[in-house]
Regions:
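Short acidic/histidine-rich motifs immediately flanking catalytic phosphotransfer sites
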Residues: 87, 132-139
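Conserved PLP-anchoring active-site segment centered on the Schiff-base-forming lysine
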Residues: 84-102, 120-121
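Helix C-cap/helix->beta junction micro-motif
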Residues: 113, 163-164
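Short conserved active-site loop signatures built around small residues
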Residues: 1-25
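Buried hydrophobic positions in well-ordered alpha/beta secondary-structure cores of metabolic enzymes
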Residues: 19, 59, 77, 92, ...
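Conserved PLP phosphate-binding loop immediately N-terminal to the Schiff-base lysine helix
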Residues: 138-156, 166-178
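Conserved N-terminal alpha-helix of the aminotransferase class I/II PLP-enzyme fold
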Residues: 30-79, 101-108
């Protein structure tokens, strides 16, 4: 299906109770349980709810991937990525024009936990080679960047990162998802 079709039809089965054709917004904090710990698919909205589940399925289908996770904010998503992929002593390489919130997350939260952070001009082949030579766990780029809107060659960065044993994380806040 085309992205436009996926966006409006994928995972949009009529609600069995109301017959709604579009998943309604689940504006509740808790869901009924048949017994303590025995729920009907959802327990608390903070862990999942029908609205978020449908959104994740639709976005995954539009991107052509198996799974998707949505978060309440971009920084929450970034925190999850960093916490899940980087350990104390490992290096994260970012660009100099990194979004300020991401910079502060690295400096104020992850550096005190032992994660190392280096800013390098990843558009410059010599600076990129030097940064990759330091053995980073992650290369972190925004494309386009915030605030300067610099665009990186993601395919080239991914290939070089892979060759050097690093992961590439791309924040595409300003780019459309598909």
């Amino acid at each position: 299906m085309r992205p436009e079709t996926l966006a409006i039809h994928f995972a949009q089965d009529p609600d069995p109770t109301t017959g709604a054709l579009v998943t309604p917004l689940a504006q509740t904090s808790t869901f009924v349980q048949d017994a303590p710990g025995v729920h009907r698919g959802f327990d608390y909205t903070r862990t999942n709810n029908p609205t978020r589940e449908t959104l994740e399925k639709v976005l995954a289908a539009m991107e052509g991937v198996e799974h998707c996770a949505v978060f309440a904010s971009g920084l929450a998503a970034e925190h999850a990525v960093l916490q899940g992929l980087v350990a104390p002593g490992q290096l994260v390489v970012t660009t100099p024009d990194l979004y300020g919130g991401t910079f502060r997350l690295l400096r104020r939260v992850f550096e005190p936990l032992g994660v190392r952070h280096l800013q390098a001009d990843l558009a410059d082949p010599a600076a990129r080679a030097d940064a990759l030579g330091r053995g980073p766990r992650l290369l972190w780029v925004e494309s386009p960047t915030n605030p300067r809107l610099q665009v990186y060659d993601i395919e080239a960065l991914a290939a070089q990162a892979t060759r050097e044993g690093a992961l590439l994380v791309v924040d595409n806040t300003f780019a459309k998802p598909v």
